[in-house]
């Protein structure tokens, strides 16, 4: 039985990179999410910027509450990145084998990334919904994962799934841009690499830079849908006193109309700067860590090949 070591290495390195970057940037993610979700309240604006969210936590002596839902977010992040990178690597390898091409084009890459993203969204949507509800609850009043998911019916755990599927275009755009830039950056190094040695890898700074550029482009193009998804998922976790109001906010059209009515067209981009700051740093860190882990994985595969006598055809170049 052939083990798809290439897909496994990609999935593992991507998941570990996501876990580390999510933990480092989680307080920023909490502030961003609470700021974006404020559209669910009518009337006065509570937060003018991210600093107001941070100051609220400090003034209420709830700084540690900036980490509420971290365990759920890490679990969701690890699983989603593992599924995504495994699916992306597997579909990409399958495409190259079936088509006979030596490289993958931009259009095919976009489709493959979207397919991997769709699988990821379906598999991790309940965890994504739970983490959003936990983050947007009042500081110090966040509930556990099971209690959060069991408050409503099972369908509530999949709030925002349709938008999550739409947002598969975000990582699709991101990784398409990143891969194309990466291929160009490594072209000369790969041509000069000796056979049997580890393929050239990006430097930490270059991986960070390319990750930031690719994620910025993807975020700007998909942000209205991102904010709409946050509002839909956060509706159940705050004001539970009015079920009718919450119910009316669970459709995409009602949320889009509500933003337009209260904030105008610029409301669709409220918090864009915060989203870019968080996602660019997160994705850049993820890809930077992934590149380093992938390079180390190659060394491990060579060791397995030599000492465990794995057949040559079963070990794929990473």
Curated annotation (Swiss-Prot):
Main location: membrane
Keyword set, alphabetical order: Antiport, Membrane, Peroxisome, Repeat, Transmembrane, Transmembrane helix, Transport
Domain of life according to the entry: Eukaryota
TM annotation in the entry: 8-28, 104-124, 158-178, 201-221, 252-272, 284-304
Membrane topology: Multi-pass membrane protein
GO molecular function, one term: ATP transmembrane transporter activity
Record's note on what induces expression: Down-regulated upon illumination in seedlings germinated in the dark.
Pfam families documented for this protein: Mito_carr
UniProt xrefs under PANTHER family: PEROXISOMAL ADENINE NUCLEOTIDE CARRIER 1 (PTHR46650:SF4), PEROXISOMAL ADENINE NUCLEOTIDE TRANSPORTER 1 (PTHR46650)
Function of the protein: Peroxisomal adenine nucleotide transporter catalyzing the counterexchange of ATP with AMP. ATP is needed by reactions that generate acyl-CoA for peroxisomal fatty acid beta-oxidation during postgerminative growth. Required for the conversion of seed-reserved triacylglycerols into sucrose that is necessary for growth before the onset of photosynthesis.
Protein name listed in UniProt: Peroxisomal adenine nucleotide carrier 1
Biological source species: Glycine max (Soybean)
